[in-house]
Amino acid sequence: MSDNSQKKVIVGMSGGVDSSVSAWLLQQQGYQVEGLFMKNWEEDDGEDYCTAASDLADAQAVCDKLGIELHTVNFAAEYWDNVFEHFLAEYKAGRTPNPDILCNKEIKFKAFLEFAAEDLGADYIATGHYVRRADVDGKSRLLRGLDGNKDQSYFLYTLGHDQVAQSLFPVGELEKPEVRRIAEELDLVTAKKKDSTGICFIGERKFREFLGRYLPAQPGKIVTVDGDTIGEHQGLMYHTLGQRKGLGIGGTKDGGEEPWYVVDKDVENNILIVAQGHDHPRLMSVGLIAQQLHWVDREPVTAPFTCSVKTRYRQADIPCTVRPLDDDRIEVVFDEPVAAVTPGQSAVFYLGEVCLGGGIIEQRLPLPV
């Protein structure tokens, strides 16, 4: 333990149970531990959705209980410039971005990492993410979290091995029920607090209402794959591929009552294209093209290789073959067709437990008709 006693770790305290237990685990490992609460969003809509104040109070209560100092920092300007504006631009272009991935890249493992090292003298930062780190041949690899249900490596694929090397992930070695049990034993205020599910800055608020404040909605037609107009949408940005709920259309005489699914968006003409059945051929893809690639611990792809991929969080691994197209684009071919591959989302690659990296889905490769 003594080799850690000179090492200072700044834990990103979110006011949740995972970061709370992370701080305690690091104390047990002998580190000098301090907390940092990041405010990434300037609330301007009253207290309806604002959890920042109560989250800060919970983070402070945990730090008081553990006897550690809590620092606060405001990254709202960085968040707006580097995460939120990109998020809006993607939606405007008809794609479905994942802002949590960008937030980890630009805020938690960039702005926070720099602030902790330069202003607080940290040797490491730590977060409550369910991932693991393994140091092999002088490089730090990113591994899936031990708890398969909670593994968050999908959200951290943009980290380089140097960022992973400066980060600790204490709860990644545990299963979620064990983390809750530890928090209850320690009588932490966060022990029974539910996990946050909203997009990192929007929180739990109604997504459609929030987006409408920044992007004017443009209603348009809902058209079937056969060209029949069967309804009206309130804005393409509110819909994503594979979506079933919230379309406001029932079954048809020919198709029976089988539910409708979004299978495509015609951004140019502002048309939402739908088909009946969750496995309709128009919803299936045989592969994808990915760009804006980030590899955690490997060189850029120069030759084909096989691995597995996830095209969204908590999806089962999809066996695939990856081929380079050019310096920053790859073609991914699935072993079996996959439903609802969504441009703008991330494709993240794995070899066993190791997260290799990933990229943004530029286009899907549709099932040949």
From Swiss-Prot:
A GO molecular function assigned to this protein is: ATP binding
Query: Can you quote a single GO CC term?
Result: cytoplasm
Catalysed conversion reaction = S-sulfanyl-L-cysteinyl-[protein] + uridine(34) in tRNA + AH2 + ATP = 2-thiouridine(34) in tRNA + L-cysteinyl-[protein] + A + AMP + diphosphate + H(+)
**UniProt-annotated binding residues for ATP:** 12-19, 38, 128
Location(s), subcellular = Cytoplasm
Which region ranges are annotated with the description Interaction with tRNA?
A: 150-152, 312-313
Segments carrying the region annotation (Interaction with target base in tRNA) are 98-100
PANTHER family the record matches: MITOCHONDRIAL TRNA-SPECIFIC 2-THIOURIDYLASE 1, TRNA 5-METHYLAMINOMETHYL-2-THIOURIDYLATE -METHYLTRANSFERASE
Query: Its biological function?
Result: Catalyzes the 2-thiolation of uridine at the wobble position (U34) of tRNA(Lys), tRNA(Glu) and tRNA(Gln), leading to the formation of s(2)U34, the first step of tRNA-mnm(5)s(2)U34 synthesis. Sulfur is provided by IscS, via a sulfur-relay system. Binds ATP and its substrate tRNAs.
Instruction: State the protein's name.
Output: tRNA-specific 2-thiouridylase MnmA
Q: Which organism is it from?
A: Cronobacter sakazakii (strain ATCC BAA-894) (Enterobacter sakazakii)
Q: What is the lineage of its organism?
A: Bacteria, Pseudomonadati, Pseudomonadota, Gammaproteobacteria, Enterobacterales
